[in-house]
């Protein structure tokens, strides 16, 4: 692999939900590299030179010759990265081995990032119009400060095991782990490695699409639209819901939604307090399978309770 990429999604110049999912880690790296505008790019920890009449750090100034030249530099390290999941597919476990080909000293740190190789949206999730995102950093392990490794002697291998209880992952099939050795004093990246996406993950994905939002009666029966993006019929779910910020309730649903089909689930009737706007939040939880896409399991809606006058 000649290039290993990490993208840190910021909250400027526009809104970005992927920044909101992990603000501390992004903010830390933005400060570390003194980023004041985006897009901004570094290669091996050094800002891209402005040799294309743009600005320092402009991604447009990166050429294939630049990449080839950087890849040709001999590194003192070899990095091997693998990852796996626990049985419930809720935790990712990371194993990194760093081997030095020669004695290496300095303020050395190992940085490890959980990334999603590809995230594609049907409509822009933010305010910049983009729908395609690649190599998005989701979590730095164990934190944005990385792991201090100490010096290496030639031939020495050091192993590191890290884990993360995952959140805000769009698709487990696209998870990759990027690990890189960096001199924290100079910010120079000395070597990087990346894991391959895990093979054999279950093809299971249930999505909550919408919930009914208009009612003429204070007696409101929420109806949730659910799509089964899996290869087998969906026969049971737990639907966790809350109205107007109240205590969450769980409705155990059984039935059948065919593979690739969309169905509806009617929740127990609730009484709304007064006309006007009310809020409902819904999450679907698989009880029999592993849902590889955990972000589309949630839906929220504002309920409009109409104040209808009854003629006398």
PLM regions: where:
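Short acidic/proline- and small/hydrophobic-mixed sequence motifs that coincide with surface turns
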Residues: 104-107, 231-236
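Short, conserved sequence motifs used for protein processing/export or organelle targeting and
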Residues: 2-204
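Enriched for extracellular/lumenal, surface-exposed ectodomains of secreted and cell-surface proteins
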Residues: 181-185, 243, 272, 279-295
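Asparagine-centered strand-capping/turn motif at beta-strand->loop junctions
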Residues: 98-100, 226-230
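Short, solvent-exposed loop/linker segments at the N-terminal edge
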Residues: 85-90, 212-220, 233
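Boundary/junction segments of secreted and surface-exposed precursor proteins
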Residues: 199-216, 304-312
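Terminal edge beta-strands and adjacent linker/stalk segments
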Residues: 193-196, 291-305
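Intrinsically disordered, low-complexity Pro/Gly/Ser/Thr-rich segments with frequent PxxP/GP/PP motifs
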Residues: 149-155, 247-274
């Amino acid at each position: 692999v000649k290039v290993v990429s990490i993208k840190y999604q910021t909250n400027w110049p526009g809104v970005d939900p992927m920044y909101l999912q992990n603000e501390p880690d992004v903010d830390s790296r933005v400060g570390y590299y003194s980023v004041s505008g985006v897009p901004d790019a570094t290669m091996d920890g050094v800002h891209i030179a402005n040799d294309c009449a743009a600005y320092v750090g402009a991604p447009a100034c990166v050429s294939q010759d630049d990449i080839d030249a950087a890849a040709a530099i001999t590194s003192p390290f070899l990095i091997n990265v693998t990852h796996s999941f626990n049985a419930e597919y809720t935790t990712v476990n990371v194993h990194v081995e760093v081997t030095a080909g020669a004695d290496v000293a300095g303020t050395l740190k190992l940085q490890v990032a959980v990334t999603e190789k590809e995230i594609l949206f049907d409509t822009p999730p933010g305010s910049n119009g983009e729908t395609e995102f690649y190599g998005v950093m989701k979590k730095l392990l164990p934190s944005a400060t990385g792991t201090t490794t100490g010096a290496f002697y030639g031939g020495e291998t050091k192993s590191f095991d890290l884990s993360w209880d995952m959140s805000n992952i769009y698709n487990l099939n696209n998870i990759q782990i990027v690990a890189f050795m960096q001199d924290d004093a100079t910010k120079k990246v000395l070597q990087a490695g990346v894991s391959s996406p895990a093979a054999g993950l279950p093809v299971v994905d249930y999505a909550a699409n919408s919930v009914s939002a208009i009612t003429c009666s204070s007696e409101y029966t929420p109806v949730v639209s659910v799509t089964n993006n899996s290869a087998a019929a969906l026969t049971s779910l737990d639907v966790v819901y809350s109205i107007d910020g109240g205590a969450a309730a769980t409705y155990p649903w059984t039935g059948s939604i065919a593979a690739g089909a969309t169905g509806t689930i009617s929740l127990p009737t609730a009484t709304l307090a007064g006309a006007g706007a009310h809020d409902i939040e819904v999450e679907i939880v698989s009880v029999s399978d592993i849902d590889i896409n955990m972000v589309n399991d949630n839906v929220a809606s504002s309920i409009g309770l109409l104040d209808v006058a009854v003629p006398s």
